[in-house]
Amino acid sequence: MKLICVFIVAVLLLTACQLNAADDSRDTQKHRALRSTTKLSMSKKDSCVPDGDSCLFSRIPCCGTCSSRSKSCVG
């Protein structure tokens, strides 16, 4: 029973701290954090295999196209 009471008090204390911190930081953040899905889509767009590198076993797409003859990326 004591353990449950300690747990409840701890949860209430942590919740109060979260609410207090949220009130203090309102409208002070200049650059808001991007969502993880946005970060993933941006990183996928930015990373590609450059021209001349092998595209045969690469998980990353070519910046241009993958040549079927040479199995390398072509711009």
Swiss-Prot record:
MF terms in GO? ion channel inhibitor activity; toxin activity
Q: List the disulfide bonds.
A: C48-C63, C55-C66, C62-C73
Task: Indicate whether Signal appears among the record's keywords.
Answer: yes
> Mind telling me which residues form the propeptide?
22-45
From the Swiss-Prot or TrEMBL record, state where the protein is found: Secreted
Q: Which GO terms describe its cellular component?
A: extracellular region
Give the main localization category: secreted
- Pfam families for the chain: Conotoxin
Tissue distribution: Expressed by the venom duct.
**Keywords recorded for this protein, A-Z:** Amidation, Cleavage on pair of basic residues, Disulfide bond, Ion channel impairing toxin, Knottin, Neurotoxin, Secreted, Signal, Toxin
Q: Which residues form the signal peptide?
A: 1-21
Which InterPro entries does the record associate with it?
Conotoxin (IPR004214)
Q: Which residues carry this modification: Valine amide?
A: V74
About its domains, the entry says: The presence of a 'disulfide through disulfide knot' structurally defines this protein as a knottin.
- Protein family per UniProt: Belongs to the conotoxin O1 superfamily.
Write the protein's name: Conotoxin Bu6
Q: Which organism is it from?
A: Conus bullatus
